[in-house]
């Protein structure tokens, strides 16, 4: 039990040391973003802004251009030996679609309706022909008794049976 109390105290002390002692305000005026400090603003990483009014205010530019970065300020009065940081991250998505439950339900219902209409179209296009028997009924034995060829008959009633009448026939 003593070890867990010591360990939880150590974790708490580590987390509290990471907390900023004072807040750094991020302001939005019209369409621009500003970081404001009582003392000077220091850029750490991200969007490099323009310093304004005695280095206490940093203009990050238009919010539509997605300003982001980490900025530091030195403290004043009781926090004059402390330093605090703020992370700014704007994401102004102009081509995004807000996916709320109503939009999601609409997409799902539309998908189901389109699938059913497609299935109905395939069913109607590839519909069954009436009056036609199955393929097994179409096949019949043309020759019986395993004959390969059907013998020709002697008939002289057709127009083409007289064409080679003078030639001898092999029977």
From Swiss-Prot:
PROSITE patterns, per the entry: ITAM_1
Main localization, broad class: membrane
Stretches of the chain found on the membrane's Cytoplasmic side: 127-171
Record function comment: Part of the TCR-CD3 complex present on T-lymphocyte cell surface that plays an essential role in adaptive immune response. When antigen presenting cells (APCs) activate T-cell receptor (TCR), TCR-mediated signals are transmitted across the cell membrane by the CD3 chains CD3D, CD3E, CD3G and CD3Z. All CD3 chains contain immunoreceptor tyrosine-based activation motifs (ITAMs) in their cytoplasmic domain. Upon TCR engagement, these motifs become phosphorylated by Src family protein tyrosine kinases LCK and FYN, resulting in the activation of downstream signaling pathways.
Subcellular location: Cell membrane
Disulphide bond pairs: 37-73
Domain of life: Eukaryota
Organism: Macaca fascicularis (Crab-eating macaque)
InterPro entries in the record: CD3_esu/gsu/dsu (IPR015484), Ig-like_dom_sf (IPR036179), Ig-like_fold (IPR013783), Ig_4 (IPR032052), Phos_immunorcpt_sig_ITAM (IPR003110)
GO cellular component: alpha-beta T cell receptor complex; external side of plasma membrane
Post-translational modification: Phosphorylated on Tyr residues after T-cell receptor triggering by LCK in association with CD4/CD8.
Leader sequence residues: 1-21
Species classification: Eukaryota, Metazoa, Chordata, Craniata, Vertebrata
GO terms assigned for molecular function: transmembrane signaling receptor activity
Protein name in UniProt: T-cell surface glycoprotein CD3 delta chain
Glycosylation positions in this chain: 38, 54, 74
Keywords: Adaptive immunity, Cell membrane, Disulfide bond, Glycoprotein, Immunity, Membrane, Phosphoprotein, Receptor, Signal, Transmembrane, Transmembrane helix
Binding partners and assembly: The TCR-CD3 complex is composed of a CD3D/CD3E and a CD3G/CD3E heterodimers that preferentially associate with TCRalpha and TCRbeta, respectively, to form TCRalpha/CD3E/CD3G and TCRbeta/CD3G/CD3E trimers. In turn, the hexamer interacts with CD3Z homodimer to form the TCR-CD3 complex. Alternatively, TCRalpha and TCRbeta can be replaced by TCRgamma and TCRdelta. Interacts with coreceptors CD4 and CD8.
Domain ITAM: 138-166
Keyword Transmembrane assigned: yes
Transmembrane segments: 106-126
Topology in the lipid bilayer: Single-pass type I membrane protein
Sites of Phosphotyrosine modification: 149, 160
Pfam families listed in its UniProt record: Ig_4, ITAM
GO terms under biological process: adaptive immune response; cell surface receptor signaling pathway; positive thymic T cell selection
Listed Gene3D superfamilies: Immunoglobulins, YojJ-like
Tissue-wise expression: CD3D is mostly present on T-lymphocytes with its TCR-CD3 partners. Present also in fetal NK-cells.
